[in-house]
Amino acid sequence: MFLKAVVLTLSLVAVTGAQAEVSANQVATVVWDYFSQLSNNAKEAVEHLQKSELTQQLNALFQDKIGQVNTYTDNLQKKLVPFATELHERLRKDSEKLKEEIRKELEELRARLLPHADEVSRKIGDNMHELQQRLGPYAEELRTQVNTHAERLRNQLTAHAQSLETTLRQNVDNLQASLTPYADELKAKIDQNVEELKGHLTPYADELKVKIDQNVEDLRRSLAPYAQDVQEKLNHQLEGLAFQMKKNAEELKAKISANADELRQKLVPVAEVVRGKLRDNTEELQKSLAELSSHLDRQVEEFRRNVGPYGETFNKALLQQVEELRQKLGPYAGDVEDHLSFLEKDLRDKVNSFFSTLEEKENQDMLVAVPELQLTPVPLES
């Protein structure tokens, strides 16, 4: 049942709090996914939307999954579960209201922009062209970096596998002692190289967010002369556009990271298999090492093929979102189901605010809890 998956995710988020900062984005995603799932499943919504029942199940699962982990986790549970439950209730109640507000906002915007419809459409088209020019080099650079670092990863791991084969031929009489360090080092190299791969590729998403902000600001300035009486409404629509575009950037980052982690998960077991066969005869071990090299090639090549096109796909998605804005502001838009992105943006803003307040309070409490240093006077010798 989806509800149990949501509760489990919230529990895991809280458990990791002792080792790392709890992510507001994680909690917002859990609540939003839960809301979206229930919105698409009327029967489950009827069964599980009551606040009291949701709170009860969340608290019960916290107790079942984490028990007495530490004071921080216990405190987080007490604050997070009621907050998440209340936020979900507000989402449900605000959805239709916000939908109507966005409909009226777009109607007023269209009416004000109608006398300048052709100019507005041209300005947005120019902005799309500028966006394409800005993002094009990033897509090409991402593909180049994927190819470069994937090839580097392949070369380093293949070289280590070849060292294993060489050592095998030179130390037939003492395989386990000679090869064990190499097998252990191979696993460490896989972890290290995959982390370096992620480190080189994931920053692209943050750079793209800067370009998105620049492009949306350019669009706002170009449309401002046509929306003098409704500038606030135009700004609101552009905020929604920027949110959607940045969400795509976050998804790009997550997809790159997930593919790198998947690559690691496929490579590490093979290294462990080789280590496990050190007690086997030489022929079996040679066969395993030969399979290791080909397996490394296949998995790295698969990663390269999967991740390489992500930049172009990302660019197309952003251009489509700007085109959708042009259609929404045009005279023939009709009804547009646009409120959900604004609802999600509002949700994430509230979660970020909640976590900022919680973090500030935790820091203040820690300062208060630190006892003052007291010096015990030492009697002077007479």
Swiss-Prot record:
Q: Which GO terms describe its biological process?
A: acylglycerol homeostasis; cholesterol efflux; cholesterol metabolic process; lipoprotein metabolic process; phospholipid efflux
| Cellular component GO terms held in the UniProt record | chylomicron; extracellular vesicle; high-density lipoprotein particle; low-density lipoprotein particle; very-low-density lipoprotein particle
Kindly give the SUPFAM superfamilies that the UniProt entry links to this protein: Apolipoprotein A-I (SSF58113)
The keyword Secreted is annotated on this UniProt entry:
yes
Name the predominant localization: secreted
InterPro entries for this protein: ApoA_E, Apolipoprotein_A1/A4/E
Q: How is it modified after translation?
A: Phosphorylation sites are present in the extracellular medium.
Pfam short name (any one): Apolipoprotein
Q: Where is the protein found, in the record's own terms?
A: Secreted
Q: Which residues form the signal peptide?
A: 1-20
Whether Signal counts among this entry's keywords is yes
Q: Quick one: where's region 13 X 22 AA approximate tandem repeats?
A: 33-330
Q: Which UniProt keywords apply?
A: Chylomicron, HDL, Lipid transport, Phosphoprotein, Repeat, Secreted, Signal, Transport
Q: Which GO terms describe its molecular function?
A: cholesterol transfer activity; phosphatidylcholine-sterol O-acyltransferase activator activity; phospholipid binding
This protein's superkingdom?
Answer: Eukaryota
Q: Where are the sequence repeats?
A: 33-54, 60-81, 82-103, 115-136, 137-158, 159-180, 181-202, 203-224, 225-246, 247-268, 269-286, 287-308, 309-330
Can you quote the domain comment? Nine of the thirteen 22-amino acid tandem repeats (each 22-mer is actually a tandem array of two, A and B, related 11-mers) occurring in this sequence are predicted to be highly alpha-helical, and many of these helices are amphipathic. They may therefore serve as lipid-binding domains with lecithin:cholesterol acyltransferase (LCAT) activating abilities.
Q: Assembly and interactions?
A: Homodimer.
What does the similarity note say?
Belongs to the apolipoprotein A1/A4/E family.
Sum up the protein's function in the record's words: May have a role in chylomicrons and VLDL secretion and catabolism. Required for efficient activation of lipoprotein lipase by ApoC-II; potent activator of LCAT. Apoa-IV is a major component of HDL and chylomicrons.
What name goes with this protein?
Apolipoprotein A-IV
Species this protein is from: Neomonachus schauinslandi (Hawaiian monk seal)
Q: What is the lineage of its organism?
A: Eukaryota, Metazoa, Chordata, Craniata, Vertebrata
